[in-house]
């Protein structure tokens, strides 16, 4: 598959949305769609849609548009969803438990194979048939099972320490839900998720609407 180098993060962040939409089209037996139709429904320009896809080879045919099946298959490969990445969650509090029970991970091909915590009241219990192990076993578990992704749901003050254990075990990527910006060595990939940031963006949008109404009065 052709792929340009240095694809912008903005393009990459649009890919999951494309995938969700194309998946919905397939579920409704829509076999093809044009870039203009896709752009109108998603709120992008047709030019932007074409440019996004051209980063990876295009996928479309002039005069035909895009086969939704071909588009879906390519997006799955681009996003690596066909690799069935193995994951562990460290920190099985409210957020960790919610993530462990999130069925979409399995539907999208991610395999949750381990849960870890330090709380003796949680260790030994199971979620979705996965036994919660003590964090002391984390490094060896990652090595033995060649785990790809570590999901970090621990308190911020221990986030770096746990991330270091993951890296020592050979983790390839860390999905960080803590408030701590962790540092990693080597080629480990980190994706930080700050839930409060999204809420503050919503707050900004609501505030702008209220300010606009106040100006009109």
Curated annotation (Swiss-Prot):
NAD(+) binds at residues 91-96. Disulfide bonds: none annotated. The keyword Metal-binding does not apply. Residues 17-56 bind DNA. InterPro entries: CoA-bd, NAD(P)-bd_dom_sf, Rex_DNA-bd_C_dom, Tscrpt_rep_Rex, WH-like_DNA-bd_sf, WH_DNA-bd_sf. It holds the Pfam family Put_DNA-bind_N. SMART domains: CoA_binding (SM00881). Homodimer. This is Redox-sensing transcriptional repressor Rex. The gene is rex.
């Amino acid at each position: 598959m052709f792929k340009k180098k240095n694809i912008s993060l903005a393009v990459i962040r649009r890919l999951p949305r494309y995938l969700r939409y194309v998946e919905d089209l397939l579920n409704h037996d829509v076999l093809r769609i044009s870039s203009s139709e896709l752009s109108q429904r998603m709120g992008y320009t047709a030019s932007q849609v074409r440019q996004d896809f051209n980063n990876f080879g295009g996928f479309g045919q002039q005069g035909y548009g895009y086969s939704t099946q071909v588009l879906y298959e390519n997006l799955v490969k681009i996003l690596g969803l066909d690799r069935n990445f193995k994951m562990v969650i460290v920190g099985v509090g409210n957020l960790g438990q919610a993530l462990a029970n999130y069925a979409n991970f399995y539907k999208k091909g991610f395999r949750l194979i381990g849960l870890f915590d330090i709380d003796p009241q949680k260790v030994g219990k199971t979620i979705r048939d996965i036994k919660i192990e003590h964090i002391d076993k984390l490094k060896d578990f990652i090595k033995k099972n060649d785990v790809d992704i570590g999901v970090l749901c621990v308190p911020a003050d221990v986030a770096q320490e746990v991330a270091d254990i993951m890296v020592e075990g050979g983790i390839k990527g860390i999905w960080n839900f803590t408030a701590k910006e962790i540092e990693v060595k080597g080629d480990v990939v980190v994706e930080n998720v700050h839930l409060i940031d999204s809420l503050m963006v919503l707050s900004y949008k609501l505030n702008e609407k209220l300010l606009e109404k106040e100006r009109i009065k």
